[in-house]
Amino acid sequence: MVVTQRFGQGHRILVTGGAGFVPSHLVDALIARGCTVVAVDNFVTGSKENVAHLIEHPRFTLVEADVSEGLPQHEPAIAERFDAILHLASPASPTDFASLPIEILRVGSIATLHLLDRAVADGARFVMASTSEAYGDPKEHPQQETYWGNVNPVGIRSVYDEAKRFSEAATMAYHRFHGLDAGIVRIFNTYGPRMRPDDGRAIPTFITQALRGEPITVHGTGTQTRSICYVDDLVRGILLLLDSTETGPINCGTEHEVTMTELAELIVSLTGSGSSVAYVNRTADDPEMRRPDLTLARERLGYAPTVTPTEGLRRTIEHFSHRLG
């Protein structure tokens, strides 16, 4: 399957959470295509620094707003019709699940409904960024899109898991009832420049600890696995879904699976650090293994990640080295 580029010069795109880690890279790619991009962010976890290089760009507008309160229609950039809406706004790290639980639930529910209504009104393509967390602690491996998941609905992670599952259900309801042109992407573990050093996820934590010469804290036995995807590959996958007419959900990530111990040791090696690995108590509801089945992404979108873990981690380490001084 070859997907033809559908959105480019002359198209107006709204990206929610646009100053966040993944969305800011997506904004870069859309600007490079010739799109006019409006990024909306309330900066709860996003950073103006991530889009500072675009502030003077004639086809970029940054609007500070909480999409859970609705889009600020008084803003000229918001009032004009959009050709596509990409909903990526949400705190997404383990530390956020405990510190921002209500915000996560609101942006996954109320904000999603506001944005779906706007997409219907504008006749826009709507892309909803879901997550591998929709599968919970999976009993199926690798995870296919047909798997319904194994989610604890009242656990510490549930605010994120269930918010995304609600967003998926809402998107499909609008697709079926209103005929909305919509697509759902289930994003697997992604890493790269612009991640927050303190966001609680394994890769930024391990890199920060290694660069500081501190012990690498691995939760549990370190045998848990993740498939790690470099952000550029993920962005390519999201753009393929945007350009397509696929509804999904479609997994996006990489099938390269590593244990947490292997990941820690690779980061220690790439940083040249003398850090040791220290095992600490495992967090609640931490999935044992996670790897996407990418058959659907390959067949329907022609998706194929290209950045190896070693190369992607090198680029990420370089970014963190500059950021941490």
Identify what each model region corresponds to.
Residues M1-T190, D232, V307, H319:
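N-terminal Rossmann-like NAD(P)+-binding domain of SDR-like oxidoreductases, especially those catalyzing
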Residues R6-F7, I13, S24-A32, A65-D66, ...:
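C-terminal substrate-binding subdomain of Rossmann-fold SDR/epimerase-dehydratase oxidoreductases
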Residues A19-V22, K48, I110, P138, ...:
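Gly/Ser/Thr-rich beta-alpha loop segments that engage phosphate groups in nucleotides
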Residues G46-K48, G136-D137, R194, M260, ...:
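A short beta-to-alpha transition loop/helix N-cap that caps and shapes the active-site region
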Residues K48-V51, E168, P204, T261, ...:
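Short, surface-exposed alpha-helical segments at coil->helix boundaries
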Residues G200-P204, V235:
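Conserved terminal C-lobe alpha helix of the protein kinase catalytic domain
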